[in-house]
Amino acid sequence: MDFDGKAISSALLEYTGDVAARAMRTDFDLLAQIARTLIEAKERGATIYTAGNGGSAATASHICNDLLKGCRVHNREGFKTECLADSCAVMTCLGNDFSYEEIFSIQLRTKAHRGDVLLVYSGSGNSPSSQFSSNSWA
């Protein structure tokens, strides 16, 4: 396989153009509302739970790290967070013994309290385990 610098440059240019176009469609009012919800949860001592499958699980885990540690950089207490996708043992236990569609909702019914917050990350929005109704856990 030959290295084709022009093809790689072209692909990178197309990719960055796509990222820039998507960034311009960001709903910043919605992001501000989400930030407000997270800050209010922190102020009342609530836990912020995150969930996702595959790459979205990695994103869900990473935001927990950022919320927990990121504030400490500025001499503020971090947020109480937990990623429901971080334990392979728990996820495979629940999936095997009950249903993979319920790997997150079972954890929430056990751990979560009224007023806690759930952030679900999904690239497609189609994963049954990432689809929650307001009554499925709270």
Mark where each language-model region is.
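A short, well-structured juxtamembrane/interface segment
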Residues: 24-44
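Glycine-rich, small/polar surface segments that engage phosphate groups of diverse ligands
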Residues: 40-112
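Short, well-ordered, mixed-charge alpha-helical segments that flank or form enzyme active sites
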Residues: 91, 114, 127-129
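A short, small-residue-rich loop immediately preceding and capping a beta-strand
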Residues: 47-51, 114-125
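Glycine/threonine-rich flexible loop motifs
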Residues: 126-137
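Generic N-terminal amphipathic, Lys/Arg-enriched alpha-helix
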Residues: 1-26
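Hydrophobic packing residues in well-ordered alpha-helices of helical domains and bundles
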Residues: 12, 31-34, 60
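Non-DNA-binding regulatory cores of transcription-related proteins
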Residues: 111-114, 118, 135-137
